[in-house]
């Protein structure tokens, strides 16, 4: 038995606005400059906006910033300290929109988890489960 397949009527498929990125990049930084250590614990998400049509339609990834590159950028920028998470997200946004001319914007988010010192010890901590700071940057 043969089945005849008929082509659908002329249909135009249009690629709409899209974004992609790397979620939940865990960043834990211990600052050991003094005897009394400091800990910063973040969960960072990077979502990039731009014209990625060639990647979707032609398989051309020339204008795609790999998700591992996004993750490694988070780690690289944190190397010199994070500071306030809002400022850190601005650094991320400025980096991606400034270094890659096809990235027109994005959404960057961070959650900051806090740690309490154990018995006022210089470098022993327990996670504070009752407090999480969040920030979102959209460009």
Per-segment meaning from a language model:
Residues 2-139:
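N-terminal intrinsically disordered, cationic/polar leader segments
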């Amino acid at each position: 038995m043969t089945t005849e397949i008929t082509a659908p009527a002329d249909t135009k498929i249009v690629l709409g606005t899209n974004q992609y990125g790397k979620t939940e990049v865990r960043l834990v930084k211990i600052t050991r400059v003094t005897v009394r250590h400091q800990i910063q614990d973040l969960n960072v998400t990077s979502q990039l906006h731009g014209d990625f049509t060639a990647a979707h339609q032609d398989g051309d990834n020339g204008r795609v910033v790999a998700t591992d590159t996004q993750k490694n950028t988070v780690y690289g920028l944190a190397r010199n300290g994070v500071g306030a998470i809002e400022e850190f997200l601005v650094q991320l946004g400025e980096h991606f929109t400034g270094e890659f001319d096809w990235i027109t914007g994005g959404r960057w988010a961070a959650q900051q988890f806090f740690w309490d010192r154990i018995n006022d010890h210089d470098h022993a901590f327990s996670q504070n489960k009752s407090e999480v700071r969040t920030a979102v940057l959209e460009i």
